[in-house]
């Protein structure tokens, strides 16, 4: 037999003998009446320690769950803060601004009420026929526009073009709504053209054509302009009706 194997066998036998001795010693201790109370106390402490470890493990798991929830909440708050900052930095100039009347003293309120209730401003709108205009797009709507449509166009540029097109709509339909006798020669020529451009598909609709845009605005009807129209169609602000060599932009 190899000397190394013999040494390993001897070490194994000695280890077993040592283990048997310790077992016999513990057995003898367990049979000693004077040590029974000590062993019982140790057993109780071991049981308490086991319960404590279980409670500790449960608490660790609970804290991990809370930590995960807090991380998710932090991500949500950071995202909302980023969106709010973007909205604050990109507030459209078209929105109404707060007037000083909101911070006026209480004794000024009766005067403000009298001005609002004045009969003349209340009667003026009823004398004019309403003209349908396009609503400005929201930041959310602009976010839904595909990137290939946007190209380098910005949210503000799209709302600016909406305002320009609304000028053309208002300018055209003010002429249409005026009595014929009150129109100038130029306005009468425009009125005649408006009538010729109407079709059965445009009945009851508000629409303009390229010539109206040239007459009432400084907008260039070019490739960039038609790119903006694609975004307005996507956002359901207008649609097109073609016929008789004209493209009619119907206000939605």
UniProtKB/Swiss-Prot annotation:
GO cellular component: cytoplasm; meiotic spindle; microtubule; outer kinetochore
UniProt subcellular location: Cytoplasm, Cytoskeleton, Spindle; Chromosome, Centromere, Kinetochore
Annotated stretches, region: Disordered: 84-111
GO MF entry, a single one: microtubule binding
Biological process per Gene Ontology, one example term: mitotic sister chromatid segregation
Subunit structure: Component of the SKA complex, composed of ska1, ska2 and ska3.
Protein's UniProt name: SKA complex subunit 1
Species in which this protein is naturally found: Xenopus tropicalis
